[in-house]
Amino acid sequence: MLETITSVNGVVNGIVWGPVGLALLFGTGFVMSVRTGFFQFGHFRYWLRNTIGAIFTDRDITAHTEKNDKAISQFQSLCTALAATIGTGNIVGVATAILSGGPGAIFWMWAMAILGMMTNYSENVLGIFYRRKNADGEWSGGAMYYLADGLGGKKGCKKLGRVLAVLFACFCVLASFGIGNMSQINSIAGNMNAAFQVPNLLTGILLAVLSALVILGGLKRVAAVTEKIVPLMALFYILGALTVVLTHVTAIPAAFAAIFKGAFAMQAAGGGVLGYGVSRAITWGFKRGAFSNEAGLGSSVMVHASSNVKEPVQQGMWGIFEVFADTIVVCTLTALVILTSGFVDLNTGRMLTEVQGSALVGEAFSTVFGSFGPKFIAVSILLFAYSTVLGWSHYGTKAFEYLFGTKASMGYKVVFVAMVLVGATMKLDLAWDLSDTFNGLMMLPNLIGVLSLSGTVAAITRNYVDRKFHGKQVEPMWSAFAEYQKEEEAEEATLDKAANE
C-alpha cells in the first residue's frame, strides 16, 4: 500500500512540479505582469512607500480593529502571511537549490520571484474583490471564492468554477497538515535535538500546548502573535546572515558572478555537464522560488482577505512586498551566506562539502560564529517553522470552513493541534513528498482562476490608477457584490464627513 502511494505520488508530483506546472506558474506571472503594465517595476517606489514604508507613518496600516470587528490590520495580515511563507524553505530550500542546481539556481529563483510578485498581487486583488462575510461576521476570501464566484460567474463556467473551488479547498486542508504542520514541526524537533539535545517528544508537547493557546483563540489571536514574532525573527536572521556575509565581503563579487555564470550554463551545476547544468539551475530555481514565497499557491490570500482594507489594489501591493521580503531579501541572504563561506567552488559551481540541507547553512554560519552556528540555525528554524504552523492553521481553517461550514472549523483546529505532536515524534519522509504534491495540486486550480480573471485584475488596477494617480472621478471597484460595495461606500462617506467637520 505504501509503495503504491509513493509511486502514485511520484507521478502526480512529476506533473504538477514538472515542466508543465512550472511553465504555467512562470507564464501566469508573466501574463499578470503584462496585463498590469509591469506594476512591480513601474510603481516600485509607490508600492514600497505604501506598504512597509507606511508602517511608521500611517496608523491605518497597523491600528488594531475594535473587539467586535472581525477583521485584522493590514500589518497583521502581512505578518500572518509572512509567518506562513517564511519557513524552512528559506533555509533548507535555498541550500537544496544550490546543491541540486548550482549557484545559477538563485538567478532563476529571483526570476520566478519577480514574476511571482504579480501573481501574488493578483491573488490578493481577487481575494479582496470576491470575499464574503461568514456566519460569524468574519471576512472569508481566497481562491475558493474567486473560483466559485469569479470563474463560476462566467458564461458556461458555473460548474467548473465550483468544482475547482472544492478541489482547491480539499488540497489546501491536506497540505495544511503536511507542509503547514507536521513537516515544519519535524524540522524543529530534529534541529533542536541535534543542537540542544532536547527530546523530540518534549519539543512536540511544548509546541502543541503553545499552538493550542494561539490557534484555538481564532484569527485575531494568531495575528496578534505573528505581528510580534515575524519582525523579531526576520531581524534576528537578517542580522546574523549579514554578519556572515560582511565578514566574507571580499567573496561577494565572486558569489554574484557564480550565480550569473551558472544561470546561463557557463559552468556546470553540481558537477554536471554544461547545458544540462542550466536546465537543472532553471528547474531548481523555479521550484524553490515557488516553495519559498508560495506565489501561485493561493494560500496567503486567505489571510490577506481578512484585512480591514477597502482597496483590492492596496492589499495586492502587500502581496508584492511579501514576495520581495521572502525571496529577494531572506533567500538571497541565505544564498550569499552559503556562497561566500567557502563551501562552493565559485569558479566551477561545484560543492566542496557533502553536508546538506540545514546542516550546510549551519556550517556556513559556523565560519563566523563557531560552534554557535548550528544553534543559530536551530533557533531560526524554530521561529520560522513554528510561525509557518500558525499561518497555515488559518489557511486550513478557511478551506475547511468553505467545505463544511463555520461551526465545523473548531473540530479542524483541534485535529491540527494534535498533529503537532505527531509531527515531532514520527519519521515523515512520505509526508514531505505528499505535502509537496498537495501544494502543486492547490496551484493548478488557483492559476486557472487567476488567468481566467486576469481581465478583472487589470480593470481593478486601471480603476485604482485612474483614481489615485490621475485624479479621475470614477466609481471605485471594491467588491464584486453590490451589498458589500454599498457598505464600503457608506463607511467611506462617513469617514470623509467626519474628516471635514
Descriptions of predicted regions:
Residues E123-D136, L242-A258, M266, G270-V273, ...:
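Extracellular/periplasmic helix-exit of transmembrane alpha-helices
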Residues M32-S33, M112-G137, A148-N186, G190-V214, ...:
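Helix-loop-helix module between adjacent transmembrane segments
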Residues R59-I98, L126-F129, A135-L151, V173, ...:
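Alpha-helical membrane segments and immediately flanking helix-loop junctions
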Residues T4-I5, R35-Q40, G89-V94, S176-A189, ...:
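Transmembrane helix-loop junctions in multi-pass membrane proteins
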Residues M1-A84, T88, I98-A105, G116, ...:
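N-terminal alpha-helical transmembrane segments of multi-pass membrane transport
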Residues F38-I72, T96-I98, G102-I106, W110, ...:
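Flexible loop linkers connecting adjacent transmembrane helices
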Residues T62, K67-A71, G102-A111, D149, ...:
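Membrane-interface alpha-helices at helix entry/exit sites of multi-pass transporters
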